[in-house]
A protein has these predicted regions:
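Extracytoplasmic/periplasmic substrate-recognition and gating elements
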Residues: 27, 524-597, 624-632
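Extracytoplasmic
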Residues: 1-237
Length: 709
């Protein structure tokens, strides 16, 4: 049990969660219980709690106690209507999140959302694939929709009536207009607009199910607002019946003005209550590229465990901008360590002599390799050193709608050939497949393109690192497949929001990352049980095996070369990245800030102990075993850019494949030669002066395998 000064409203909002408090009765007798609370989310509604004392609910009135809306940063006192008899001594009081008064409304709304989404999918099938990028869409075309869906007007009318009834139910429950579910009335307006011109319905699916402001998605957003029961408890009073309570003023950290002070306070040395400010120069300094909630949680954990065990004081600061670290280093004002950096920053800093080579510490590979994938270190390697450690990781996996694939008679694809085979069925039903290539219109990063090269045995760099590898047959095969999936098989080129497309069913399957997983877990209750994840589709090899190489790195940690406390910094880094600390940190985050704060650790052992569904953990860990990262190089930016430009030119502008790849090769090789000359690998005549090692991580892994590790 962890002692928390006050509970944040977001930390305890999911059905079934409980908060426990110890309360002490000074003598036997009848006591009244009051709460100083803040409920800032449900305008015109209540958040509900069932109250237990010593494991039991003493009387019915303590079930589903409503805490009315207070406003943001505004507190009120609420006294339970009936007193409770308590014996002298300590008692355990529990508040369980519940929403029983709204369950009927919630279930009705869930049914409506699913019916609207199912109707949207059926309409797409009727309409067919005339909505892709290459199709000439006739928005003036009208449909005799009643011939295909005779009851569509009745459906629209029934949904409108049911949604209005749900709104009125919630109004009756709260005793006032439920402004927090005002989206329900916007949903009704959308449905009524569709009913006015039924022949245009297939061309206006954005009003029904396909857009973030559609009827289905507005109603689904309301589901979350009903389901979540945010409530902050500042303190609990145990008192006599007529006792006057203190006025419910906001606490010291409430209110806008004090909120600003608290924000500024997070940058001060006083943030570190464990530090001896008189010996500030002796403290280990750490900059973190994370929001304040993450920093504060780590600060507390460090004080409780690391400093207590080692005696090393640690000062934390929120990093204003990781791009400014170079400037800080030039003035000697950089910290000893940085956490939460973009995964490629350590190598970039190493090229400027700013980072410590972690291989200088004899045990680094032993403890790191035991709990992390050493391939994650590839973008942090430079020449013969490793200058950062992977901290958090993405997981790119295949997301799929079980309900839709079943209805189409499709199975989960294992290879890209399987994906190609399913595309005609998806197209016939006006659906598509997502790849990260479609999620960023302007730039295709290594994370989006690398999987296709690596699965085919290709690479961005030549074996010696002095040229691009675009002329290699394996690399060309990967590049061609990456292009033909769009040119020949019609994958959608532009899906700016895969989550919304997946939710509506217009893109019921695709490769995406941790962010999508989190959105589905916490923001799409209507899809519970309707979706799942699988391994990324792979490329079948000559021996029948399937390669599934894909990127996974997210953030990294590093030690600065001008630090005077390298040993202390390394000791902290080793503690911070250990499975025990990572798991404890993940738990503390969710305890303090709620289940939405899922820590995407890169530690395999820690992830295995986290609260992901068991089947999902198995998929994530297996996909991680295929992690393959693009090496960072003095000229890596040009290779990333040229592959991106080539894809855009070939797929969207129709340029010939080989001619455009040849152009990318020339541009890349010219820039590689210029950068390697700048860094002293080539002389002014282009002659090699020294080798460039691009195989360090492979060599380290091979050596460990030979040693039986």
């Amino acid at each position: 049990m962890k002692r928390i000064n006050a509970t944040a409203d977001e930390s305890n909002k999911r059905m079934g969660q409980k908060l426990y408090y110890e309360v002490e009765a000074p003598e036997d007798g009848l006591y009244f219980i009051s709460f100083k609370y803040c409920q800032p989310k449900k305008t015109g509604g209540c958040s509900y709690r069932t109250i237990e004392i010593d494991g039991n609910v003493p009387y019915t009135e303590l079930r589903d106690v409503g805490f009315a809306y207070t406003g943001i940063n505004t507190y009120q006192n609420k006294t339970l209507e009936t007193g409770v008899y308590l014996t002298r001594g300590v008692h355990l009081l529990a508040l369980e999140v519940t929403a029983e008064p709204m369950q009927a409304s919630y279930r009705e709304l869930m049914t409506i959302v699913n019916e609207i989404n199912d109707t949207g999918i059926a309409l797409k099938r009727i309409k067919g694939n005339n909505s892709g990028e290459s199709a000439g869409v006739d928005t003036n075309r009208t449909w005799d929709i009643l011939q295909y869906m005779p009851d569509i007007l009745e459906r629209l009318k029934d949904w409108s009536a049911s949604l209005t009834a749900v709104y009125n139910q919630l109004k009756d429950i709260g005793g006032m207009e439920p402004a927090y579910v005002s989206d329900l009335m916007l949903t009704v307006q959308n449905l009524q607009r569709l009913a006015e011109k039924p022949r245009e319905i297939p061309n206006k699916l954005s009003l029904l199910s396909d857009d973030s402001s559609s009827a289905a998605q507005l109603a689904a957003l309301t589901l979350t607002k009903i389901y979540e029961q945010s409530l902050s408890i500042d303190c609990i009073y145990l008192h006599g019946e007529n006792e006057l309570l203190p006025a419910p003023k906001a606490g010291i950290f409430s209110g806008l003005a004090v909120g600003i002070k608290q924000f500024l306070y997070s940058f001060s040395r006083d943030m570190n209550e464990s530090a001896d400010v008189q010996n500030e120069g002796q403290m280990l300094t750490v900059w973190i590229n994370k929001p304040s909630q993450y920093v504060e949680t780590l600060r507390q954990l460090t004080a409780d465990e690391f400093t207590r065990e080692t005696g090393i004081e640690v000062s934390f600061s929120i990093m204003p901008d990781e791009k400014k670290i170079t400037l800080a280093n030039s003035t000697g004002s950089n910290p000893d360590l940085a956490l939460g950096l973009s995964y490629y920053r350590p190598a970039e800093f190493a090229m400027r002599g700013m980072a410590v080579n972690l291989l200088e510490f004899d045990d680094f590979l032993d403890w790191y390799g035991a709990e992390y994938n050493l391939r994650a270190l590839a973008p942090m390697a430079y020449e013969d050193g490793v200058y950062g450690a992977s901290e958090t990781q993405e997981f790119y996996v295949l997301f799929y709608r079980k309900d839709i694939l079943d209805s189409l008679g499709l199975t989960v694809p294992d290879t890209w050939e399987d994906v190609k085979a399913m595309m005609p069925v998806l197209h016939r039903n006006a659906m598509n497949f997502n790849l990260p290539l479609a999620n960023n219109v302007g730039y295709k990063s290594f994370e989006a393109t690398g999987g296709f090269l690596f699965q085919n045995g290709g690479d961005y760099y030549s074996p010696d690192g002095f040229a691009s590898n675009f002329g290699d047959p394996n690399t060309l095969r990967g590049l061609r497949e990456m292009v033909e999936l769009y040119q020949v098989y019609g994958l959608a080129q532009n899906i700016p929001n895969f989550f919304n497309a997946f939710r509506s069913g217009s893109v019921p399957i695709g490769v995406s990352n941790f962010s999508t997983y989190l959105q589905l877990q916490v923001g799409a209750p209507e899809l519970n049980g309707r979706w799942d994840i699988a391994l990324v589709p792979g490329t079948q090899q000559a021996d029948g095996t399937v390669r599934r190489d894909w990127s996974a790195d997210a953030t990294s940690s590093m030690i600065f070369s001008n630090s005077q406390k390298k040993q202390e910094a390394y000791r902290f880094l080793k503690w911070w990245l250990s499975s025990g600390t990572q798991l404890k940190y993940a738990t503390d985050l969710q305890m303090k800030y709620g289940p939405d704060y899922i820590w995407n650790t890169g530690n395999r052992v820690a992830l295995a102990g986290m609260s992901y569904p068991l089947a999902h953990k198995k998929v994530i860990l297996e996909q991680w075993s295929w992690q393959h990262e693009a090496l960072r190089h003095p000229a890596s930016y040009i290779l990333e850019r040229e592959v991106s430009n080539a894809w855009i030119a070939i797929v969207t502008q129709g340029e010939p494949f080989q001619a455009r790849i040849d152009e990318a090769t020339l541009a890349s090789n010219r820039e590689i030669q210029r950068k390697l000359t700048e860094f002293g690998y080539l002389d002014e005549n282009g002659q090699k002066r020294r080798d460039y090692n691009i195989h360090l991580i492979e060599d380290l892994i091979e050596n460990r395998e030979e040693d039986g590790q």
